[in-house]
Swiss-Prot record:
Pathway linked to the protein: Aromatic compound metabolism; phenylpropanoid biosynthesis
KW Oxidoreductase (keyword) present: yes
Protein name: Probable cinnamyl alcohol dehydrogenase 1
Free-text comment on the cofactor: Binds 2 Zn(2+) ions per subunit.
Job of this protein: Involved in lignin biosynthesis. Catalyzes the final step specific for the production of lignin monomers. Catalyzes the NADPH-dependent reduction of coniferaldehyde, 5-hydroxyconiferaldehyde, sinapaldehyde, 4-coumaraldehyde and caffeyl aldehyde to their respective alcohols.
Similarity field: Belongs to the zinc-containing alcohol dehydrogenase family.
Binding site for Zn(2+) 2: 100, 103, 106, 114
EC number from the UniProt entry: 1.1.1.195
Keyword Glycoprotein applies: no
Length: 354
């Protein structure tokens, strides 16, 4: 069965310069190779990475740039050697579309840490082409980087799992944050933070949301089911949390202090950093004297991604989303910068290009 875009034009929206303004764009996807899967994109989540690269914040953007790495859709064609997928399957594609497949990390299903991994957009693939992401009608990927979405799990809800979901799930599993009865602190309540709360509750943890904004209290407790809420600037509230948490997931964007949060951990506690502040300053005593750890993490490997999707389907865990059409994307990206979304924008791709 031929793919909708095939070797012809693929409709998309792209940024042409560091203004980050996106507009309609056409380009050619590669032909399906023997180990490739081609999918019609139905939905694509909107991540802050889309802002960073469309606006050249990291000074490495390659224009025209088609963003989007939270992709969900339906298989339209498979290569001759593909055994894991068939036409009609619901699938997802995440933050990377290639890796060396031969290093220690790849052989351990940690492809996200492969030194040669290729980003889903604004990356350079092995054939020298610049990758283009999910703000488009169609994508072709090697089957290793494609993931099954169980029938019945809404594709619009599945899309954010491919970045926001796995970015939280992977460090939680690596640090055994799935022990019922333990306590979890979640710093920040955006796209990643709200997924950390959902996973924490599903794991049977006592979840405390820590935010700079009192306005997040109702969302945290009434909407997401957190057990506790603390405003980080309130010294009295923070004092009551000292040495009470087994784990902390830090999703806060931008620069922020670390010592006040590390003191909230029990002896042997772990704080996982998921964001990219410009620097990290920590007093050694807050680590050494409590046997505490500060750990970094970025997305997740292929094994974890499929496991996470299956876990969400089995436990009816769904991201909270605001659905938009592609022609609203410039407003949505600015709203994301302004932190005006609850909790993830998802583009209705299949109804945006008709």
């Amino acid at each position: 069965m031929a793919a909708e875009c095939g070797s012809g034009n693929c409709d998309a929206w792209a940024a042409r310069d560091p203004s980050g303004i996106l507009s309609p764009y056409k380009f050619n996807r590669r032909a399906v190779q023997s180990d490739d899967v081609s999918l019609r994109i139905t939905h694509c989540g909107v991540c802050y990475a889309d802002v960073a690269w469309t606006r050249n914040i990291l000074n490495n953007s390659m224009y025209p740039l088609v963003p989007g790495h939270e992709i969900a859709g339906v298989v339209t064609e498979v290569g001759a050697d593909v055994k894991s997928f068939k036409v009609g399957d619901h699938v997802g594609v995440g933050t990377y579309v290639n890796s060396c497949r031969d290093c220690e990390n790849c052989n351990s299903s940690l492809e996200n840490y492969c030194s040669q991994h290729v980003f889903t957009f604004n990356g350079v693939d092995t054939d020298g082409t610049v990758t283009k992401g999910g703000y488009s009608t169609h994508i072709v990927v090697h089957e290793r980087y494609c993931f099954k979405i169980p029938d019945g799990y809404p594709l619009e809800k599945a899309a954010p799992l491919l970045c926001a979901g796995i970015t939280v799930y992977s460090p939680m599993m690596r640090h055994n944050m799935n022990q019922p009865g333990k306590s979890l602190g979640v710093i920040g309540l955006g796209g990643l933070g709200h997924m950390a709360v959902k996973f924490g509750k599903a794991f049977g943890l006592k979840v405390t949301v820590i935010s700079t904004s009192e306005s997040k209290r109702k969302e945290a407790i009434d909407l997401l089911g957190a057990d506790n809420f603390v405003v980080s600037s309130d010294e009295n509230q923070m004092e009551t949390l000292k040495s009470s948490l087994n784990f902390i997931i830090d999703t806060a964007s931008g620069d922020h202090p670390f010592d006040p949060y590390l003191t909230l951990l029990k002896v042997g506690g772990v704080m996982a950093l998921l964001s990219f502040p410009s620097e990290i300053k920590v007093h050694p005593a807050n680590l050494n004297l409590g046997g505490r750890s500060l750990s970094g993490s970025v997305t997740g490997g292929t094994k974890d991604i499929q496991e996470m999707i299956n876990f969400c389907a089995a436990n009816k865990i769904y991201p909270d989303i605001e659905m938009i059409k592609i022609d609203y994307i410039n407003e949505a990206l600015q709203r994301l910068v302004d932190r005006d979304v609850r909790f993830r924008f998802v583009i209705d791709i299949e109804n945006s290009f008709k």
